[in-house]
Amino acid sequence: MKKTSINTGTPDVKVDEAALVTPFVKCLARLVRAQDTYGSQDRASDAELLAHFIITEEQRREIPIIGDPGPDVMLRFNIFYTAVALSIEARTGLVASPITMISHEGFGRVLLTTGRLVVFSKTVRDIHRFGFATLRKLAEAGAKLVDDATAAIETYPEVARA
């Protein structure tokens, strides 16, 4: 039987304090809180809010190989890349815009643009399996995307500001 949080009914996540204090994870937690328009998760910790982004190996094995993404998965996917864009903006001072084009089958493309510069482009598939093994892996993935995008902006600043 899976342990769940008393506050939110979400699966318990091994709390990684170092991951929770990273700028990217703080931004992601703010965005998740912003989606809670009724305040039903006001008392939840950041780790509890981010538990939906964590998919253990056991949980991943239970997810079918082929499947359509549900609205909750699509929301998590969009929030993740929006957090990347906001973190880029916080670091560089330039507005970064996420563009996601996902089919109903969970295949598509993610772009992040700043000015006329495409700072991130990725073809995605199996969105219904979107998630990370731990909070640390979530933080590392987000930070890497932000670092790579920032490096692209520093390499081509005139295009990013156009």
UniProtKB/Swiss-Prot annotation:
GO biological process, one term: nitrogen fixation
Keyword Transmembrane helix: no
InterPro entries hit by this protein: NifX-assoc_nitrogen_fix
UniProt xrefs under Gene3D superfamilies: Protein of unknown function DUF269
Annotated keywords: Nitrogen fixation, Plasmid
Family (UniProt): Belongs to the UPF0460 family.
Protein name, as recorded: UPF0460 protein y4vQ
Organism of derivation: Sinorhizobium fredii (strain NBRC 101917 / NGR234)
